[in-house]
Swiss-Prot record:
InterPro entries: SBP-like, SBP_dom, SBP_sf. Zn(2+) 1 binds at C67, C72, C89, H92. Zn(2+) 2 binds at C108, C111, H115, C127. A zinc finger (SBP-type) spans 64-141. Expressed in stems, leaf sheaths, and young panicles. The SBP-type zinc finger is required for the binding to DNA. One of its GO terms (cellular component) is nucleus. Its main location: nucleus. Residues 7-19, 37-48 have a biased composition (Low complexity). It holds the Pfam family SBP. It comes from the Eukaryota. This is Squamosa promoter-binding-like protein 11. It is found in: Nucleus. It comes from Oryza sativa subsp. japonica (Rice).
Length: 343
């Protein structure tokens, strides 16, 4: 009996094909599976982001303000906020003449606007209206200046001082001023104000207040539009408009005139009003009419002296008494300096 081997069809399938296995590519590691696909996706994402950034930059560049001057159109993205806000480049803010919207204009650095060239003064960089307002703010108000027509004198005049001096020129003729009864000037230098001066001086610690009226100083013009300088501790300042010049001259009429007539025009005199308290035991010493009591002054470059006249008034705590005012009424009482015009 013969045994023939049976051919098996599965033998070939049981054998490992090493050649085919060697020629095949090794499988990618687990962490690298799909790497080509992920790299391409990230690259596309980067390209998308760069395109978006470029679009944003283009939009910003399109929205950047430009100079509104015709023929310029400079982009102001790199300029300061001031120039971007007003849409003008720095060189054109200093030009004397530019064209904006078809009209000649000039940039005002105070208003930050364009104005017509006629609104500027020469080489000024600001318009005339703004310069006027700016200069008005820079001017400081005058200090220690008061009008003689005001009700009271400033309190600063009575701080640590016992003397207030008013100076004017008495050489001018009396008829230089208007002597008619219809004069529009009003007298505010009342006797109550004289009392107020004395009370203020006593509050400041002074036992008496002297108001020295020095005639013959060529400093006053009789025009009401002139200024009256104050001669005293603060001589650097001048008085304001002489609205009440007549008031002082009316008071002068009580001093410069004698009890029976006018003083010689060629003889210069000065007068002193002395206020003394009736409650005090001591009184102010009288000023002699000769010796060193003469008040010096200058007339036409020559040093001269005047003889003072002293009128002493008693100041009571409750009442103020002026017993001799009526007896010294001047003979020219019908004029503007008459006693009857003092209220």
């Amino acid at each position: 009996m013969e045994c023939n081997p049976v051919s098996s069809t599965t033998s070939s399938s049981l054998l490992w094909d090493w050649d085919a296995t060697a020629s095949a590519e090794p499988p990618p590691p687990p962490g690298k599976r799909g790497g080509r696909d992920s790299s391409s996706a990230s690259a596309s994402a980067k390209r998308g982001r760069s395109a978006a950034a470029a679009g944003d930059a283009a939009a910003v560049a399109a929205e950047a303000p430009r100079c509104q001057v015709e023929g310029c159109g400079l982009e102001l993205g790199g300029y300061k906020e001031y120039y971007r806000k007003h849409r003008v480049c720095e060189p054109h803010t200093k030009c004397l003449r530019v064209v904006v919207a078809g009209q000649d204009r000039r940039f005002c650095q105070q208003c930050s606007r364009f104005h017509a060239p006629s609104e500027f003064d020469q080489e000024k960089r600001s318009c005339r209206r703004r310069l006027s307002d700016h200069n008005a703010r820079r001017r400081k108000p005058q200090t220690d200046v008061f009008a003689f027509g005001s009700g009271t004198l400033p309190r600063s005049l009575f701080d640590d001082r016992q003397q207030i001096s008013f100076a004017w020129d008495n050489n001018a003729p009396l008829n230089h001023a208007n002597t008619t009864s219809s004069s529009s000037w009003t007298s505010d230098l009342q006797l109550s104000q004289v009392m107020d001066i004395s009370k203020r001086s006593r509050k400041a610690g002074a036992d008496s207040a002297n108001i020295r009226l020095s005639n013959a100083l060529p400093t006053l013009c009789h025009d009401t539009n002139e200024l009256l300088p104050i001669k005293g501790a603060d001589a650097s300042e001048t008085a304001s408009k002489l609205d009440g010049a007549l008031d002082v001259q009316r008071a002068l009429s009580l001093l410069s005139a004698s009890s029976r007539g006018l003083t010689d025009p060629g003889h210069q005199t000065s007068s002193i009003i002395q206020f003394t308290n009736s409650n005090q035991n001591s009184t102010l010493p009288s000023v002699p009419s000769e010796g060193n009591s003469n008040v010096p002054f200058w007339v036409d470059g020559q040093h001269q002296a005047v003889e003072p006249q002293v009128f002493q008034f008693t100041m009571d705590t409750g009442n103020t008494v002026f017993p001799d005012l009526e007896r010294i009424k001047p003979s020219y009482e019908s004029s503007m300096f008459g006693l009857n015009q003092i209220h």
